[in-house]
Amino acid sequence: RQRQMCIRDSVMAIRFKADRPGKQNLTFSYSPNPVSTGSMSADGANGLAYTAHLDNNGMQYVVRIHAIAKGGTLSNANGKITVKNADEVVFLVTADTDYKINFDPDFKDPKAYVGVNPAETTRQWMDNAVAMGYDVLFKQHYDDYAALFNRVKLQLNPDAQSANLPTGKRLQNYRKGQPDFYLEELYYQFGRYLLIASSRPGNMPANLQGIWHNNVDGPWSCLLY
């Protein structure tokens, strides 16, 4: 399983592969945020679109999901994309809001912070992503973030431990008090990766929780400090 957030192309790409053909059987569904009001609809034969607004401030947003399978079958019904007996499946996700960065707003204007139409931007991003395909998206993502990521290297232990041990097992051992320098290196670089993927010139800086938590209103209101 591979996942990356492609800033350059404004799309999240998730690829599932198995070591044997025809073994990908899974269902993709989107769980709406509990403090929003919206509706789910089919978006083409292999896609879903969720159009909604937040209940507290009315901010509009759209989430699109599109599936691409090699082998097997795809079905799209009741707000779910079901994949059966595929060799490989890629899910593409685009999302946007109508929020506009405005450093000098007219507070009497109810549209002071309203910008793009998210239905249009997410459609354009999705069409571009589908046309490029996973391999092109991955290369562009890698080239984009690696230019920043590869500026720093951290090696805490010259006798590097095996990198093949699953992260879940590493965390389990670490909680039991077993030292793992590789895990500490991994967490350091993972934090850098998230920051690189969440804050770039021209956008808002990363807030207290970053953009990767699962709440509309995170702890401490996700303020900027």
Please annotate each region the language model reported:
Residues 1-4, 8-224:
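Aromatic-residue-lined binding/catalytic grooves and analogous aromatic/hydrophobic interfacial grooves
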